[in-house]
Amino acid sequence: MPEGVTVSEVSSPKDLKGFVELPYRLYAGDADFVPPLRSDVRWMLDPAKNPFWMHARRTLFLARRGDRVVGRIAAIADDEHNRVHADRTAFFGFFECENDPEAARALFAAAETAASTLLPGCDKLRGPVNPSMNDEVGFLIAAESEPGPPVLMMTYNPAYYLDLAAAAGFSKEKDLVALLAPVDDRSFARLGRITDAVRRRNPELTFRTIRMDDFPRELEKVKVVYNGAWENNWGFVPMTSEELDAMAKKLKDLIYPPIVWFVEKGDEPVAFMLGMPDFNQVLIRMGGRLFPFGWLKFLLGRKKVDRIRLLA
């Protein structure tokens, strides 16, 4: 007889370690899993470091069978989301679980109960978000072909997660679509023709790459365009200055300036395109650690990246 499922709140450094470490065991042997850096996961969860928690709260849970951790989940309340959307929606995130419907139901139930405490009057639980709508969002559902390893900042999970969520009473609320396009000389030429046509028809617009020597001001322009362009999109929550600053510190050494572009009308930014090398192609070989040898694998592998992640 299998031991029963128990769910408990993460309340000690040992529990937190179990929470962080679970995916590395669950996905062992999965050639498409990209292990996130453990330091990044801890940073995301840390209310003292991640500025998202300045306007949000969370409770973390572990599911066990005996001494074995079989699942995890976070209940999250984001005051900024509820201010913008004028609702009482809470979230779940960081969900990982063995193919164990009983454990999954217990985790979702714990998150629902915690959400009512974190957000009195809560009437909806949505997820996964890890930890916000500006981070990894949703379950991976399908791809036109074999999905392969995820691109930087994209979600990844086993197909059975959809069944676990459905068995616990969840249903799909929204499809979020990511597109993959091959790039070759013909596509570059076509993009060049489109850009030239836009310039001819709109001579008041200027196109330029990012000025890394004026990074703080450039970052403020990203914030203005991003929050303005996305404000009517489903589920959007504007990034605070603190969140944008934190993201910039993480990305500054990763972005490739020739593929970060601004479009301006006079002195006003009206569009941007942020291109980043898909460093997941390197992270997949690092085992979730920078030390002792992860940093060397990163330095040796970063120049071999042949895919770009675009945000615009």
Language-model segments: residues:
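Generic start-of-chain signal for non-secretory N-termini
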Residues: 1-32
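A conserved beta-strand-loop-helix scaffold within acyl/acetyltransferase catalytic domains
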Residues: 23-65, 75-83, 217-311
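Acyltransferase donor/substrate-recognition loop-hinge adjacent to the catalytic core
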Residues: 3-5, 155-235, 259
